[in-house]
């Protein structure tokens, strides 16, 4: 899967995309992450990407021109893509939506910033997604959340289909308690059923939890 990210702050993604599972998926050629700095597409001499809002209001609004030109350029290859904008008014991301997005061959994610995005630019996108009812500085962190939860659903990224199926929310259930070594620690013991070797009993215990 290819994921293009349109952002004013591409440097925010370097640590996330170059660590852990996402880095391994990138190196293995399973995922293809591409960062696009919206400022590079500004027609302004000073690379401006925002301006005051018509009708007043607090804060600046992202202008449509840099977004349109950036989008136009990265879609020149003709490959179809699902265009997503991170915005507080969008659908709240959950595991069902993540699975839906994981079925796409390519995603393009626009990170909102400032007071919002010019509605003419928003109209170019297929979907609007939020990660919750709270205020963030910009859309970069929501984009990271989308990238992470969608990527781990792509076959081969986790290395095992069972890893994906066992995780919290995969079947509408939260994950069961996990234990590691040692058997006893500070007077706290691992449940006996987990040490029994009886896989059927373990499975029932996990489901009950």
What name fits each language-model region?
Residues 4-6, 34-36, 82-84, 107-108, ...:
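Hydrophobic/aromatic beta-strand patches that form the interior of the parallel beta-sheet core
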Residues 20-24, 99-103, 124-126:
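Short, solvent-exposed amphipathic alpha-helical segments in soluble enzyme
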Residues 63-111, 118:
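S-adenosyl-L-methionine/SAH cofactor-binding core of RNA-modifying enzymes
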Residues 117-169:
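Structured adenosyl-cofactor binding patch, chiefly the S-adenosyl-L-methionine
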């Amino acid at each position: 899967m290819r994921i293009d990210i349109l952002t004013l702050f591409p440097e925010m993604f370097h640590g996330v995309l170059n660590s852990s599972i996402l880095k391994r998926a990138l190196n293995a050629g399973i995922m293809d992450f591409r960062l696009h700095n919206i400022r590079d597409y500004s027609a302004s001499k000073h690379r401006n990407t925002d301006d005051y809002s018509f009708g007043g209001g607090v804060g600046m609004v992202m202008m449509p021109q840099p977004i349109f030109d950036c989008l136009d350029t990265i879609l020149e290859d003709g490959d179809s893509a699902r265009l997503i904008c991170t915005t507080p008014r969008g659908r709240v991301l959950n595991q069902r939506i993540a699975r839906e997005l994981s079925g796409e061959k390519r995603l393009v994610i626009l990170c909102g910033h400032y007071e919002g995005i010019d509605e003419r630019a928003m109209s170019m996108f297929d979907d609007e997604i939020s990660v919750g009812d709270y205020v963030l500085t910009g859309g970069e962190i929501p984009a990271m959340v989308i990238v992470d939860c969608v990527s781990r659903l792509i076959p081969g990224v986790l290395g095992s289909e069972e890893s994906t199926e066992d995780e919290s929310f995969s079947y509408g259930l939260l994950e069961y308690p996990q234990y590691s070594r040692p058997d006893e620690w500070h007077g706290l013991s691992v449940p006996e059923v987990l040490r029994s070797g009886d896989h059927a009993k373990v499975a029932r215990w996990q489901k009950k939890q």
